[in-house]
UniProtKB/Swiss-Prot annotation:
A single MF term (Gene Ontology): oxygen binding
Keywords carried by this UniProt record: Cytoplasm, Heme, Iron, Metal-binding, Nucleus, Oxidoreductase, Oxygen transport, Transport
Tissue expression summary: Expressed in embryonic (embryos, coleoptiles and seminal roots) and vegetative (leaves and roots) organs.
Record protein name field: Anaerobic nitrite reductase NSHB5
Top enzyme category: oxidoreductase
Pfam family, one: Globin
Annotated heme b binding sites: 45, 59, 61, 84, 88-89
Family: Belongs to the plant globin family.
UniProt-listed Enzyme Commission number(s): 1.7.2.-
Record organism: Oryza sativa subsp. japonica (Rice)
Entry cofactors: heme b
Gene3D superfamilies, per the entry: Globins
Record's catalysed reaction(s): Fe(III)-heme b-[protein] + nitric oxide + H2O = Fe(II)-heme b-[protein] + nitrite + 2 H(+)
Complexes and interactors: Homodimer.
Amino acid sequence: MGFSETQEELVLRSWQSMKKDSESIALKFFLRIFEIAPAAKQMFSFLRDSGDDVPLENHPKACESATQLRKTGDVKVREATLRRLGATHVKAGVADAYFEVVKTALLDTIKDAVPEMWSPEMKGAWEEAYDQLAAAIKEEMKKAA
């Protein structure tokens, strides 16, 4: 299944609504990842030795992913970015299971951020966008390994 224009519109419309609070939403997203899988904290080089009190909202890497779409206004990812993401994920030792953790955290975070917009169609749109991105990153991980 491809990413349809309707799905792209749902993702972009919900992102428009969330981007004004993207830093706070990014913080909630990362905290949700660590709630689901505490060991995931070790995947982030800037968090490895940080203890329990991590000021994620002040760290640019924590919010970088959530703000890229705001800056570009586009859901497409450049090939060079995918290569970098693949290499970074291989270096960090990211396993397939973590992609599901991130997907769950992403969907939970979006649902909480835009409850008035949330619907089965929006969930499906974000799932499709994430699944395509995750598949592309995994493909680049295979090449980088």
